[in-house]
């Protein structure tokens, strides 16, 4: 595996890989876990070579968020990626991605509104900007993202469609299902922030979501189920709920009656100082 930190050697490395066959990109912020490695393994099923980016993007963190505390473990991440057969690791510093005088921002409206877009103003502008840059830098034939960040995936697909991106084309931006711990908690780098007691309590989140979905499928009013879900999250050990909402899986517009239209349940909640997100389909399938 080749590790590069500067743009010029990245371009040379990408050109060599692309000459040998299709190239897949898995963008990450590092602190890799089994969820990330699942993306890498899926990427290998679609391409001759896999490139992974590790960049803790300062533009997607708010003023009071966890940029400085976000876990960084490059040496360990390199070892994991090498063991998975990754061909290229792109690990730039912030000054390489955003040099002096940088003045361009990518903003995607609509799907970025509400949910995490409301709770974290400016977050998706930072996401769209860095992913657009990564796509331009690596020129992948396809890119893979985890469905835990469902809204992020919708933003990236909208950006690719609206900007007529060729590499990757919007249809080659793939979502990979959420990877969960044995107790159901969605895998996340931020789980490392949790104390043992918080980690045990965090497993109540997916259980409460599953119970709410089961109640909706049983015909109970969605508003009642969401209200009960919020209370169960708090009683399970969380300190607050940023949102618990039903949205259309594609457009992300609010859904009031999941019995009559496709819906997905989205939740963001805080346990201690840690913010966790999750989402699940509301369907009998």
Language model features by range: what are they?
Residues 4, 254-255, 264-285:
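Short, basic/aromatic-enriched C-terminal tail that caps enzymatic domains
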Residues 171-172, 260-262:
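Short solvent-exposed loop/turn micro-motifs enriched in small/polar/acidic residues
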Residues 241-259, 265-266:
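A conserved acidic, glycine/proline-rich C-terminal tail/linker
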């Amino acid at each position: 595996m080749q590790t590069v930190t500067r743009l010029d050697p990245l371009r040379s490395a990408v050109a060599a890989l692309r000459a040998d066959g299709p190239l897949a990109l898995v963008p990450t912020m590092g602190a890799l876990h089994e969820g990330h490695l699942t993306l890498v393994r899926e990427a290998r099923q679609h391409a001759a070579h896999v490139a992974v980016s590790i960049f803790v993007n300062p533009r997607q963190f708010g003023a009071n968020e966890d940029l400085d505390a976000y876990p960084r473990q490059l040496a360990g991440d390199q070892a994991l990626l090498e063991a998975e057969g990754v061909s290229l690791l792109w690990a730039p510093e912030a000054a390489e991605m955003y040099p002096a005088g940088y003045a361009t921002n990518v903003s995607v409206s609509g799907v970025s509104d509400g949910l995490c877009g409301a709770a974290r103003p400016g977050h998706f502008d930072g996401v769209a900007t860095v992913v657009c840059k990564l796509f331009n830098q690596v020129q992948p034939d396809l890119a893979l993202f985890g469905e835990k960040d469902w809204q992020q995936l919708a933003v990236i697909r909208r950006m690719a469609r609206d900007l007529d991106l060729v590499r990757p084309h919007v249809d080659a931006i793939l979502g990979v299902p959420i990877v969960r711990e044995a107790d159901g908690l969605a895998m996340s780098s931020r789980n490392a922030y949790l104390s043992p007691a918080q980690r045990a309590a965090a497993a109540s989140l997916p259980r409460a979501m599953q119970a709410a979905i089961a109640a909706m499928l049983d015909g109970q009013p969605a508003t009642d189920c969401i209200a009960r879900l919020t209370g169960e999250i708090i009683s399970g050990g969380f300190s607050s709920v940023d949102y618990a909402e039903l949205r259309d899986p594609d457009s992300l517009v609010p859904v009031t009656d999941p019995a009559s239209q496709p819906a997905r349940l989205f939740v963001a909640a805080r346990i201690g100082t840690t913010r966790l997100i999750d989402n699940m389909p509301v369907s009998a399938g």
